[in-house]
Structures are given as structure tokens and as C-alpha cells.
Amino acid sequence: MVITVAKELPPAYEPEHIARALKLADVIAARAPAHDRDASFPFENFADLSREGLLALTVPAALGGIGAGARDTARVLGIIGKADPSTALVLSMHYIQHLVMARSTRWPGRLSRKLAKETVEGVALINALRVEPELGSPARGGLPATIARRTATGWRLSGTKIYSTGAPILKWYAVWAKTDEAETRVGLFLVPAGLPGTRIEETWDHLGLRASGSHTVVFDDVVFPLDSEIDVRKPDDWKVPDFTQSTVHAIFVAAIYDGVARAARDWLVTFLQERVPANLGAPLASLPRVQEVVGGIEARLAINARLIESFASDFDDGFQLTAIESNIIKLTVTNNAVKAVEDALQLTSNHGLSRTNPLERHYRDVLCGRVHTPQDDSTRVSAGRLALGV
């Protein structure tokens, strides 16, 4: 029995947006090898996603979007992640921002409505730019070096952001910066892409997720309006993370890497069914040892499906969840995904690591799950400290 997230309901009961994602998946998957090889950005994927209304998946229905919750969004990300995880990662960051807009009391309504309208009408993506060369990820603490200076006519922004996923296509940046006020505040400012003084340095040359366009964005005295504050507070007020941001980020990232493992599993099954070594005279799939390893892969993917489904459904139903719980699920799902692909490589020998076969690419992509925030060591330390009361 094969358990998948994408097709767990009879087709007649599938929401329309799931059907649209499934329809696009084959097209997106066909483009993935070339974009991976060239580290080129898949602009055409986002044009297709926009045409199908899927960029507005988490935009509230009242604002013209689909209004999907975490469960359906995780399913879409799993489908697209299986086809091309680079595209799915950019998409996930965009989805998270619109979920936060819809649920946060801190996002200015005028700004969230403007961005919702643009997303419904065209290709208008947003991502949070947070990571810096010296700071690393702010998830581990510390103040950003990027600074917003207040003037009579607008904010003036200077700083450098690295690993800015989707940089080639983003229309909006939610930039993590500190102010130059007498009492420093820190938080997010909404900055339009392409303003004078902004430049993208194409620094992303990674082992995996090569088509995600996670380049460096440099702000050199960039001017933007004073009313573009999203959420700027005293540093101590950020000790408790935004609930929506922290929980859905972890589960959406997990869904993407689970999708990668499912792509690897599908290729493996076909390979084992078709590969007939001369000394065996039968497909590799006939060997008990092979069946056992594939069964182990199925077990890991079945666990992943249940974890993602149950957690996302609980979030949608309003259950009280914690960031630590979501981080543990991300840790478990991504490590299951990595192990599933490693087991697939074990069965395929040189074939699996050949660049003519997709398993090599899936392996490079799935390894990124181990370094993607929240990282495993941080999750374990947080869970351990909570259990020990320290």
C-alpha cells in the first residue's frame, strides 16, 4: 500500500486548488532538471501558478483569494515540492506572509489589502528578508546590522541580506531591520523591490535547491515611505515569536522536503521494477532485501503524512499548539525524508548518483532540510530545556 498526501481523497472530493496543483506538477517537474543544472530561476512556473490562482492560495477569500488554511497549503506545497522544491520554497515563503497578514493584528490593514489585491491579479510575491552575513539567522537571537533611519520624508534603509529566497521575482520585501531612534526598535518594514539603491547580487550557488534564487540583496540608502512599518517593536518584545509565523513555517518546510522524498521514492520504484541484472534474470523488485528497504521508506513516508496532516489540521481547527511542537515535527519529517532518499541510494548503487538520473538531484535537494531553519540542534536544545525546566 502506498500512502501519499496529495491523493488521499477520492478525486470527486478534491478541492479545486488541489486539482490545479496536481495539473501543474508534471509541467513543473519537467522543467526542474534544466533549472537545477543551470541554477536558473523558474519564472515560468510562477506565471503558471498565478494563472491557476495558486499564488493567492492563502489570501483570504474576502479579499479575492482562495483562503486556504495550513492543511491544504501543506498539501499544495507537498505536490509542488515533489515536482520542484525550489519553486515550492519560494511559494511557501509567500504563503506564510499572507497567512500572517490575515491573522496578525499588527500588519497594517491598508498594506495587507494592497498586497492581497496584487497577488490575486498577477505575479506579485513577497518574502521576509532576515538573514545577514554577520548575524546569520535571527532565529538564534541578536540584532540586525541593517538599519532604518527615520527622516522627515521617509525611511532610509541600508544593509545586506543573504539567502533571500526568490530574490529574482519578488515584488515586495519584508525587511528585518533596526531603527536609529534613541530607543532602538527592531522589526519588519515593507519595501518595494527595485527601488533606487537596491541591487541583487547573484551569490546563490548551492548544492541543493539551486533554482530558488536565494541571492544577496543589498540596500544602499534606499528611501521608502514612513507608513511602511509592518511590525516594529522593542527588542525584548520579540522574545515570544509570532505564533502563525513560527508554526506554519516549520510545517510548510517539512511538507516540501517530504515531497522531495516522495519524488525519490517514485523514481526508485520504477527503477527497481525495470532493472533486470543479467545474473539475476528478474527485476530487482523481486528480491526480499529490496522489498524490506522499500518497506522502510514507505513507513517513514506514512509517518510523515500523518504528522503533517494532523498538525496542519489542528492549526486550522484552532488547537493550542507550540513552536517547539511544530519544530519537532519539522525535525522528524525532514530527517525521515533524508533517510528515505539515502535508503533509495543504497539500493541503486552508481545509478542513483549518476547525474543522468533524478535521484542524485533529489538527494542534494533533500539534504537542505537539515540546515533549513529551524535547525535540528536548536530544536533539540529548546525541547530539552523545556523538559528540564531550565
Model-flagged regions — what are they?
Residues A19, G259, G295, A299-A302, ...:
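Generic structural signal for well-ordered, non-transmembrane alpha-helical segments
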Residues F43-R51, L57-T160, T165:
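Glycine-rich flavin
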Residues N350-V390:
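Glycine-rich phosphate/cofactor-binding loops in nucleotide/flavin-utilizing enzymes
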